[in-house]
Amino acid sequence: MAIERYIGIMSGTSMDGVDTVLVEIEENSIRLMGENSFPMGEDLKQALLDICLGQSTNLQAVGELDHRLGHLFADAVIALLENTGISPDSITAIGSHGQTVFHSPETQYAFTMQLGDANIIAAKTHITTIADFRRKDMALGGQGAPLVPAFHQQLFSSLDTTRVILNIGGIANITVLTPNQPVTGYDTGPGNMLMDAWIHQHNGSQYDVNAKWAKTGTVNEILLERLLDEPYFKQPAPKSTGRELFNLPWLKQKLSGLDIPAEDVQATLAEFTAVTITNDVITYQHNERSELSTKQELLVCGGGAHNPLLMARLAAQLPKWQVMTTTERGVDSDNMEAMAFAWLAYRTHHNMPGNLPEVTGASGLTSLGAIYPAS
C-alpha cells in the first residue's frame, strides 16, 4: 500500500486550543510530519462551556457554534499546511473529532454531540474530511468511547510487557495492553478538568502551570473521600464520562459545609485524579502468583503528562510500574489524540473498522465516521 498523508484535528474536553497533526501512514506504520496548536478564542470557549454545563440554549446558538467551530478547525488546518509547506492536494483526508458538548451513552435515547461542521472544513481546506466518529459505535450499542485504544494497540502492543496507556486530558482514560489478552479501555474519571476549572475560577489562569498552586496546598482527606464516593467509580467497564458529570457545580456540592482554603482544594483535586487513575491501573497489576512475568509500564500522554505533581503521585502510588510519558516510547505525548483521529480517518477511508467492541461495548466491529468530499 502506498504512503498516504492525513491530518488529524483534536479539540478535547479541556478546550485549551485545537491540536492538528500531519502524518504519513503506510499500512502498519505512522510517522508524524508536522504539528501545530491553534488558539481558541475565550468567547468561543466560554460559549461552549456554557452549553456543556447545562445552561439554557437554543438551536440557533448550537448551530452557530457548529458553524464557528467548522471555520476554526479549517483555519487550524490551513495554518498547519502553511507551517509545513505541504499542499492540500497531497493530503488524502482530514480526520476531525469535533468539539464534544454532550456525551450521554447510558440513557434510553443514547447520544453524543460533537460540533464543528465538517462541510465547512472540507470546503475551506479543499480536503476530504471525515468526522462524526462516535455515533456509529453507539448505533451498535457501544459507548462511542474511548476510540483511541485501537490506535494505542497499533502502536504499543508488546509480547513481553504489560502496558497501560494513560491519557490525561480533561477526562482521564486508560488503554490496557496485556500480552495475549483482549484490549481493555475506559474513562477513569476527571483528568485536568476540575483542576483547570477551579484555578480559572480563582485567578483566571487556564491551568495550574507545573502544579505550582496545588503544591502550596494540603490534601483534605474529608473532601477527597467525598469526591471518591461518586457512583461512577464503582461502575464496571465499558464506561465513559465527561463534563456532564464532573464540573464545578458537582465540585461545589462536594464542598458543601466544608471551609477549605482554595489551594487545599486544588491539591485535593490533583490527588483525586491520581487516586482514581491508580485505583484502576492497580487492578491490572500482576500479583506474585500470576503466570505473567512481563514488565509493567504506565505510559502517560495528554496535558497531564506535563503536571509534575500528578506524575510524581502516580509513580509513588504505583511502585511496581515504570511510569513514563509516551514520548519516551517514541510517540509525542502532546499529539497522541490528534494522531489517533488521523489514523481513524485512514481506517475509514479504506473501509476498515476503527472501534474495539471489547472496549466500547458495541455489538461488532465497524468503520467509523462520515465522509465529506472536498468537492
From Swiss-Prot:
Q: What keywords appear on the UniProt entry?
A: ATP-binding, Carbohydrate metabolism, Kinase, Nucleotide-binding, Transferase
A single Gene Ontology molecular function, please?
phosphotransferase activity, alcohol group as acceptor
Q: In which pathway does it act?
A: Amino-sugar metabolism; 1,6-anhydro-N-acetylmuramate degradation; Cell wall biogenesis; peptidoglycan recycling
EC number of the protein: 2.7.1.170
Specify which residues bind ATP according to the UniProt entry for this protein: 12-19
Pfam families, A to Z? AnmK (PF03702)
What SUPFAM superfamilies does this protein map onto?
A: Actin-like ATPase domain
Q: Which InterPro entries match?
A: Anhydro_N_Ac-Mur_kinase, ATPase_NBD
Which biological process annotations from GO are given for this protein?
1,6-anhydro-N-acetyl-beta-muramic acid catabolic process; amino sugar metabolic process; peptidoglycan turnover
Membrane-spanning segments: none
The reaction(s) annotated as catalysed by this protein in its Swiss-Prot or TrEMBL entry are:
1,6-anhydro-N-acetyl-beta-muramate + ATP + H2O = N-acetyl-D-muramate 6-phosphate + ADP + H(+)
Annotated function: Catalyzes the specific phosphorylation of 1,6-anhydro-N-acetylmuramic acid (anhMurNAc) with the simultaneous cleavage of the 1,6-anhydro ring, generating MurNAc-6-P. Is required for the utilization of anhMurNAc either imported from the medium or derived from its own cell wall murein, and thus plays a role in cell wall recycling.
PANTHER family per the UniProt record, alphabetical: ANHYDRO-N-ACETYLMURAMIC ACID KINASE
Family membership, please give it: Belongs to the anhydro-N-acetylmuramic acid kinase family.
Instruction: Report what the protein is called.
Output: Anhydro-N-acetylmuramic acid kinase
List the source organism. Photobacterium profundum (strain SS9)
Q: What is the lineage of its organism?
A: Bacteria, Pseudomonadati, Pseudomonadota, Gammaproteobacteria, Vibrionales
